[in-house]
């Protein structure tokens, strides 16, 4: 039978391993959620409005006419960005913070406009069945 000291050492080693493994997992989750948000916004700036809308949470269950309105709103948004900033030159992921217990994340994207202005936007994300979607 193990003594108390041996059991404590084994427990500490197991907990240390669990903590280290968890940090790697959270980094991978944050990277995946953030890169997914970046990909959805890349669809937006490339004019692929249907793909952008498809990246929204539960987009597969909305009525077709509402989906068309959302795609039209995305197109209007891009027109406004073209009018205000001569368009968007790039979207890049700055950082992402995930809440693994709630299967949510916040992706911070840097939008670089063609008029040299930039801004950071927060894209709330939710994970469903292993896939990340915009809230």
What are these regions (language model features)?
Residues 18-19, 95, 121:
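The N-terminal extracellular segments of secreted preproproteins, especially immediately downstream
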Residues 19-46:
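Short, low-complexity N-terminal intrinsically disordered segments enriched in polar/charged residues
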Residues 46-63:
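Short, well-ordered alpha-helical segments enriched in acidic and aromatic residues
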Residues 71-118:
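Surface-exposed, charged secondary-structure patches
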Residues 34-41, 49, 53, 71-74, ...:
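Extracytoplasmic/secreted envelope proteins and their assembly/folding machinery
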Residues 1-20:
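Sec-dependent bacterial lipoprotein signal peptides
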Residues 118-135:
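Short beta-strand edge/turn micro-motifs at domain boundaries
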């Amino acid at each position: 039978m193990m003594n108390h000291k041996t059991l404590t050492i084994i427990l500490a080693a197991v907990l240390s391993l669990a903590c280290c493994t968890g940090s790697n997992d959270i980094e991978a989750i944050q990277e995946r959620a953030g890169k997914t948000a970046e990909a959805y916004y890349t669809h937006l700036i490339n004019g692929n409005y249907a793909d952008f809308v498809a990246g929204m949470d539960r987009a597969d269950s909305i009525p077709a006419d509402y989906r068309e309105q959302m795609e039209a709103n995305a197109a209007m948004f891009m027109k406004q960005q073209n009018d205000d900033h001569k368009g968007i030159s790039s979207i890049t992921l700055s950082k992402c913070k995930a809440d693994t217990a709630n299967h949510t994340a916040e992706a911070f994207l840097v939008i670089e406009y063609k008029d040299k202005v930039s801004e950071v936007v927060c894209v709330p994300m939710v994970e469903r069945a292993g896939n990340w979607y915009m809230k």
